[in-house]
Amino acid sequence: MDYSLETTAEDPWVRISDCIKNLFSPIMSENHNHVPLQPDAPLGEEDGMRGHPDGAAAKLDTTGGGPKAYKQAGGSTVKKGPPVAPKPAWFRQSLKGLRNRVPDSRREMAASCQPTPTSRERPGPPLRASSSIKQRISSFETFSSAHPPDRGAQRLSLQASSSSGEAAELPRKQEGERASGPSGQGAPPTMEQQRPEPEQLPPASPATSEASNPGVSGHPPLEQQPGQKTLSSDPDPLSRLLATQMEGPRGPVVKMPSQRARSFPLSRTQSCEMKPLDEKTSKLYSISSQVSSAVMKSLLCLPSSLSFGQIPCSPKEGVLPPTAFSEDPTNSSAEASASDTSFSLNLSELREYTEGLSESTEANDCDHCTSQPGQSVISLLSTEELKKLIEEVKVLDEATLKQLDSIHVTILHKEEGAGLGFSLAGGADLENKVITVHRVFPNGLASQEGTIQKGNEVLSINGKSLKGATHNDALAILRQAREPRQAVIVTRRPTLEATTDLNSSTDSSGSASVTSDVSIESAEATVCTVTLEKTSAGLGFSLEGGKGSLHGDKPLTVNRIFKGLASEQSDTVQPGDEIVHLAGTAMQGLTRFEAWNIIKALPDGPVTIVLRRKSLQSKGTPAAGDP
């Protein structure tokens, strides 16, 4: 075609438009269709040349004659040059720069795009789109970074305009911010902060839970995006936020264990000081739980090697025979395990030692010989705990001091996860309100040590008092004692003196008084032999008591006699009679369930039973025809 008729002076522009057509991609050609700029702005002219290679559309975008120009471009078969004046030399130089280095044009575009929003004068949809783009660009330059916010910024730009060129322009502006001069609003510090940001902020990822969705527009969500690897150029508020987030990676990792570590010592010190128990329970529970807690806390503070080696060597300790504590380092593992089983002491010995210690710390050599288990426990306690213990002992009255003779502190050394060797019975929610030892397992630690017996009242386990605890709570405390390598159990043996003295201070006098009554009346009991006829209904009476009953270990006795029993049999068997032998089988030490199994296994016919009948009936037991 001949271009010389109309565009002889415009031939360079035709060639320039061809260059522009080759240089720019379709995305760049569609990039600024919705962004009207001033005709004197170089970027607007450049954008017009980009968007329309024929040159006519660039002029008509600024003058508002778009429909007419497009009709000319589509209807004519001859390309016409734009009806504009020749462009200055600097514009051609910029085009040459575009050929040589394409990223520089992007930087100039980002730099020249900043002052353009102030020169907009045309209303309408393009103006609204351009104003929204300006807000997005300013917020993008202020708060965004290279990786995740690109998606959120592209979503924001796509909501404002459907042009794909606007979504592609935002990452290019981010690249142009590094080379932008004074026209870039805080771009250099932003990019400087974005460099170390991927290394600093990923540990602060816990803050992402507080950040909102990145697709929501507005400044508050963008201010919360520093947790999502974003950072602001404003150094005052967000630098402090960054400082708190930099402490964040160690905060959550260290904070949670520290909270747990704080909770356990607080619970131990509370049980050691016994402030709640001093108000609600007796002084006896206070002193026993204090000793248990202090000893357990001291054992946990010792290393495992020292706790296994130091404790058995410091005693000569109490209940176990002296052969169990061999100090020969070449002893066998069996002897070492025997030495690690346990040791026990009486609180009365500990009281005597603390009284002597309050007068003179190095005196009382005779006590050193007689109460070596007490010394081993005292050596475990810190000075503060020992002072508290001495103060508690001084406050106790004589009646309470006598009760210390029946209280024993047992320290069991075991493996992690191993049981203590006994079970519990009773609870505040059961008929028997007192927590007692239900059963001592034959091969357990408690059986090997020998201090803990069936029927003993359990005052505390590892510093946790069982006063007023329900049965499930007591079992939970017993299960928790499996984890440590040591266990401290404070028990009390019911005695005759303890039953009368503890009646006012504790609620456990019931089981102790019953046991003491049995011991007194057993001396005055008479033994008799009777023969009963066993039928399909049994022997005609029910049983109560037995090993591991609700009231502790008690002998098997006749509870009540069923109706329909022969008169001669009802006279021979009375409620409260203790069954000693049944068909040649000893009934001592059996549970009620085991005794019933023996009775059920008997064939029908005559059965010989040896009974022990008390001449003085217990309180509350009817005397049905004493002989």
Curated annotation (Swiss-Prot):
Listed Pfam families: PDZ (PF00595)
Gene Ontology MF annotations: cytokine activity
Low complexity composition-biased segments: 154-168, 231-242
Keyword Transcription assigned: yes
Coiled coil regions, renumbered to chain: none
Function summary: Interleukin-16 stimulates a migratory response in CD4+ lymphocytes, monocytes, and eosinophils. Primes CD4+ T-cells for IL-2 and IL-15 responsiveness. Also induces T-lymphocyte expression of interleukin 2 receptor. Ligand for CD4. Pro-interleukin-16 is involved in cell cycle progression in T-cells. Appears to be involved in transcriptional regulation of SKP2 and is probably part of a transcriptional repression complex on the core promoter of the SKP2 gene. May act as a scaffold for GABPB1 (the DNA-binding subunit the GABP transcription factor complex) and HDAC3 thus maintaining transcriptional repression and blocking cell cycle progression in resting T-cells.
The protein's name: Pro-interleukin-16
